[in-house]
Structure formats: structure tokens, C-alpha cells
Amino acid sequence: MPREIPLGFPDVRGLFSRARLLAFPSTIAFLGVFCMSNSDPEFEGIAPDGFLSGGIPVPGSLAGRARAVLRVAAYPLLLAATVVVAGAALSLEWDPARVSPLFLVGVLLYLTLLERLIPHQRDWHPSTAEWRWYGMYFLLTMVGSALAQLLVATAVGVVAPADPALPLGAEIPAALLSGSLAGYLAHRLGHTNRWLWRLHGVHHVPQKVNVANNGVNHVADIVVAQGAVQLTLALVGFSPESVLAAGLFTAAQGYFVHANIDVRIGRLNHVLASPEQHRLHHSTDLAEAGHYGSDLSLWDHLFGSFTWYAGREPAAVGLHDPTSFPATGEILASLLHPLHRAKRRRPSA
């Protein structure tokens, strides 16, 4: 039984003992961002004259320099926080039912703050009305997540999964890769299958990309997408500890890539997903709208859906045909949309 989250000081020796399982990959990822900031032509760090390389002027003021540093440090800080929380949760045996939502709230607050400090597009901030709509969709997304968990738990009760066969240090990356592949395939099917597109297309209606509208989803789309990932992990037989660690990273990445923030990760785009890639995914130009991975970009490379290159930005985001779905504010109509007879072709992959 997972014990309560302690109010006192944690067992530091136990924390480091379990957290070291994550130390090597997280350190590589953390340092990689800073290495890219010094080697990638797109951004070579902050020059002494107050300019961020890549042609972005930085005022000589402390605030301007702080924003420039934040553009480089924002993602490594998120990765570091994810590793710390995962390590603490594994070491102290925190209840995943508490850790996951609290961690998600922290990620949302952090990214929402970044959207104000270093926005990619200032006119992509949600309006008052959009905040209300996005809040309703977020609640519906939580309902979809709960339904997915219920269905997976029922299925696992019928089909007994295998027991964990790997040490935790190997199991965590294996769980991450397996869940990431399942998520990629489910997402791509959401675009290529005409029935699933009528669910997933609801997410692509907004003509802006930000943290808040990452929750704009059809309930059934969440059941399908999250159910596919959870069922894969359960049937393979990954331990709850490895699923928790991989899930924290996936959750952080999923909201990070959807954030309206001016952050670039350079060559790491070829390994990890980023806001740069996900804006292309939401492009109205279907020729550049690949990038179905929201955590790793490996699968986009492998299956030919990687379209990013440095400096590439979509001219507009949203639906290729805005009239093919109800507006975001028409929540009930969006939920009922899959029941209506299809009149237009789905977008291609």
C-alpha cells in the first residue's frame, strides 16, 4: 500500500537510491539543451552586447536579460522538476493517485506563467470566453481519462498481463518507448481514419495553440487515445512504478509541446517533441502538419511524419476547412458532431 505523502523531511538516502535510476537519461537530456544552446546556429546563447543569437534583440535591462535566459532554461527546468518528482515518488512510495494530479497542476501553472513571460504569439492568449470554454473541455477530458482507466482496468481483469520482467532502471525507458509508440499510432489514426477524425478533429478547431486549449477534446477521443496507451502498458506488464515515472514525463511533455512559449530546443527536436513541432502539427497546411508524437519525435522520423526544420513556422493553425466542425464554444454541438453524417473528407496524414 502506498503510504501518505509525509509532512516531514524525506528519507534522503532512499530518494537518491531510487532517483539514480533516472539520473543518466535525465542528465543527458538536461545538459543537451544547454549544449545545443552553444552549438546550434539557431540560438548560441546570450551575447555580451545584450542580444540573443538568432537575431532576437534583448534589452540591456535585467528583465530583458532574464527573459532571454528563461527562453533557454525553461525546458531544462521542466525536465529537472519531472525527474525530481519522479525520483521522490518512487523513493517515498507516494500514491500515484495524488502525485499525478498535483504534478499536472504544477506543470500547468509553470507553463501558463511562461506563456505570459515569453509568449510565442501574444494574440494566442485565451480570451475570457475561451477560458470558460477551455475549462469545460478540461473537465470533459478528465471524464474521458477516468473512463479510459475504468475500461482498461476491466480489460486487464479479464486478460491477466505478464509480471514485470525487467529491473526498474530498464523498465522505465521501456515503458516510455512502448507508451509513446502506442500514443503515436493512436494519434495518427485519429487523423487518417474518418470515424476517429470526427472525434479528434474537435481538438484542431481553435485557431491558436496554448496550454489551456490542450484540453479541448472530445470525450470519446480521450477514451480511445489514452485507453490505447494504458492498455498497451498494462498488457505488456510494466510495473506501477515504471508507469508512474513514464507517465509524469509524458504528461509534462504533452502540455509543454502545446504551450504558447518562445522556446526552441535545436537539434533535440530530432529526439524530443517540442512546441515548434506541435505548432506545425496544428497547421492549416496539411503538407507540413505531421508530428503525431507529443513526447518523443523518434516515431515521426521512423514513420515519415517529421516535417520540422529550424525556423519553420505555420502561417496559420486550425482546421484546413473551418466549416467542417462546430466552433469551439459550441460544446454540445462538438460532442454530438460524430453522430452527424460526414459531409467532407478527412485530412490526409
Describe each model-derived feature in a short phrase.
Residues D95-V105, A170-G179:
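Alpha-helical transmembrane segments
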Residues Y75-A88, G106-T112:
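Hydrophobic core of alpha-helical transmembrane segments in multi-pass integral membrane proteins
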Residues S37-L62:
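Transit-peptide-like, low-complexity N-terminal presequences
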Residues A86-R98:
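Short, hydrophobic transmembrane alpha-helix segments
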Residues L113-Y134:
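Transmembrane alpha-helical segments that serve as helix-helix packing and pore/cofactor-lining elements
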Residues W133-A316:
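Membrane-embedded catalytic scaffold of the fatty acid hydroxylase/desaturase
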Residues A315-A349:
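A membrane-cytosol interface segment of integral membrane proteins
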